[in-house]
Each structure stands twice: as structure tokens, then as C-alpha cells.
């Protein structure tokens, strides 16, 4: 059968993409869905990196659909649900129908499953754990080749596969992307602010040994420190 997977540029989805293409070849169609929520220049950059590895990636412009789904929403869980629904039911569901794909390769890792089951947070990429039958709901089966690995294990696989350090060592980035770093309503203008701030923070702290660093756009003024 034909399989499809969505590349986000993170180490998990990138490893799945390389493994999938080496196993399935032309039977795997890889897409990068630009949801308007990514880092600065990320869609084009990721497509170029995979092209150097001779892996074709189709760039899908779905920015208007995602921004429309998020309009007026301020609750974090409602925003996460809107992104999940738009991704799986609308954009990805449409692509699956167009390609006649019967399988979805997904970069779910062990930590995603544990956090969802424990109720720590709802992971956007966990379907069965949140009561969704993808075959019944969307028409495809989900394959999760990384579900027994944690992030450090995935990074080791990435290095073995020859993925560049900018992907293999990339700091964790949430599935709903910059939408999780905008407090309150997610608009195009507010996304642009946090996108520029994220770019600055990551460039300045990129050589540090910190596990995570990020920028958040608040809804109001916050306490500051003056020299």
C-alpha cells in the first residue's frame, strides 16, 4: 500500500521520514504542512535539508485554514483541539484521499504516550489515547516506529541515519508550534511577534547547553527588571 507522513522539521518526524523512505521508497509520500505556526523560514529550510538527502517533500500551504480555525480562541486546550482537528480531519484527511494512502507514518515517541496517559498534557499526535480511531475517522492506519524510544534514543538514530546536527540536536518544539507560545488569541500579527522573538532567542542561546529556551508572547504587561 501507499503511505504518507507529515514532516515538521523536528528530530522525531525527520527520523520517521528517512526511515520510511529507505524502507518504502516511492511508496511513501512526505508532505510539510505550513500551518502558519512554524519558526521563521522553517518550511523552506527543512524541505531543502531533506532534498540534499534525496528525499522529496511537498510543501503544502494551509496557513489560512489553521489561522481560521484558531480565530477567537483563547483557551489552550481549545486551541490545541482546533489544530488537531484541522490537521487530521481537514488538511491531512484531504491529502490522504488525494493520494489513496492507507497508512500514516507518525513520529510518536514513548514520552508522548506516557504524558497523555498520565494526564500531564494532551499530545497532539496521540490518537488512540484520546479516543480517536484513525481508520474509522480518517480512513488510514497509523504506524509509529519510534513509540518505544525516548528523545535521546531518537537523537542517536538521527545521527546514525546521517541527519545534520541542526535537526538531530534541535531543542524540543511543541507539536502545535508557536500557538502554544501565544497567550490568548492566536493572530497573524501576534504570531509574527513571537516568531521573531523565537528567532532571536534561539540564535543567542543556540550554543548554550540548555535543554530548552523559548520566547512567549503574553496577553498583558509582565513584571520586568531594570538595571
Regions found by a protein language model. Give the residues of each.
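ATP/NTP-dependent adenylation/nucleotidyl-transfer catalytic domains that generate, transfer
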Residues: 1-227
Amino acid at each position: 500500500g501507499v503511505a504518507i507522513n507529515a514532516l515538521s522539521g523536528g528530530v522525531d518526524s525527520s527520523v520517521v521520514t528517512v526511515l520510511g523512505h529507505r524502507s518504502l521508497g516511492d511508496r511513501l509520500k512526505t508532505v510539510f504542512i505550513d500551518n502558519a505556526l512554524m519558526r521563521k523560514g522553517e518550511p523552506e529550510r527543512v524541505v531543502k535539508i531533506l532534498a540534499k538527502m534525496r528525499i522529496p517533500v511537498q510543501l503544502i500551504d494551509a496557513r489560512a485554514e489553521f489561522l481560521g480555525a484558531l480565530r477567537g480562541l483563547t483557551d489552550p486546550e481549545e486551541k490545541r483541539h482546533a489544530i488537531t482537528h484541522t490537521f487530521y480531519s481537514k488538511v491531512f484527511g484531504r491529502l490522504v484521499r488525494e493520494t489513496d494512502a492507507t497508512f500514516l507514518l507518525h513520529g510518536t515517541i514513548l514520552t508522548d504516550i506516557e504524558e497523555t496517559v498520565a494526564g500531564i498534557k494532551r499530545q497532539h499526535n496521540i490518537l488512540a489515547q484520546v479516543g480517536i480511531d484513525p481508520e474509522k475517522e480518517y480512513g488510514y492506519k497509523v504506524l509509529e516506529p519510534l513509540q518505544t524510544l525516548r528523545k535521546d534514543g531518537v537523537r542517536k538514530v538521527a545521527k546514525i541515519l546521517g541527519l545534520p546536527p541542526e535537526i538531530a540536536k534541535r531543542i524540543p518544539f511543541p507539536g502545535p508550534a508557536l500557538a502554544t507560545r501565544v497567550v490568548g488569541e492566536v493572530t497573524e500579527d501576534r504570531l509574527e511577534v513571537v516568531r521573531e522573538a523565537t528567532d532571536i532567542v534561539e540564535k543567542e542561546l543556540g550554543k548554550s547547553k540548555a535543554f530548552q529556551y523559548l520566547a512567549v508572547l503574553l496577553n498583558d504587561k509582565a513584571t520586568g527588571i531594570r538595571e
